[in-house]
Amino acid sequence: MVNLTKLLITCVLSYCFLFADNNSPYVMVLGTAQDGGAPHAGCVKNCCSDKWGSSGKQFRVSCLGIVDPKTKEVWMIDATPDFPQQLNELTQNGKYKLRGIFLTHAHIGHYTGLIHLGREVMGAKEIPVYVMPRLKHFIESNGPWNQLISLKQIILNPLEDHGIVKLNDNLSVTPFTVPHRDEYSETGGFQVSGLTSKLMFIPDIDKWDKWEQNIREVIKDN
């Protein structure tokens, strides 16, 4: 099923970037569904039945793209099972350069798209992948993900809670943690900041009242 909370929060918090002028950084909402997309594998309920065989009714897994039209650079937040289509849309069929991928956590809808960077598919070279400490350890300790490291197809860049990452002169990203099922890694969200605007992207969280932040105040501040 589609996670309507993801859709609402993504759309509301993206407002300031989506209506930027042609030369300003902006974001692309590349997906809004939970880990398995919609329709889900094995789903025969009404929420899925009309989506099988109809690509126009299908929903891709939650993913956000960051675009700087001045530098022709793009970044992704999360590498989903829909990575091929989302990458192509974000880079405009290769016209823009993928400069990095930020991962939120180790649930299948948020990191398994990395497999397409391997030698069986893209054979990528040193794509920066930004990860929090537990997620970094998970990728380093488990195949096939650690093969991406050994073959230098990805370069892991460690993140710190609320540590600012400068992407270029126009953009920065700040990670933070949120409460969620953390079986294999912590769960993060990201604040994306431009020169005049910023937004916050939280694709997964258990409950807003479990977070030490007040979501209403966060929206006001972003």
Please tell me what each predicted stretch does:
Residues G31, V131-P133:
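Short beta-strand/turn micro-motifs composed of small residues
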Residues V2-T10:
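Sec-dependent signal peptide recognition
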Residues C11-A20:
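Hydrophobic h-region of N-terminal signal peptides that target proteins for export
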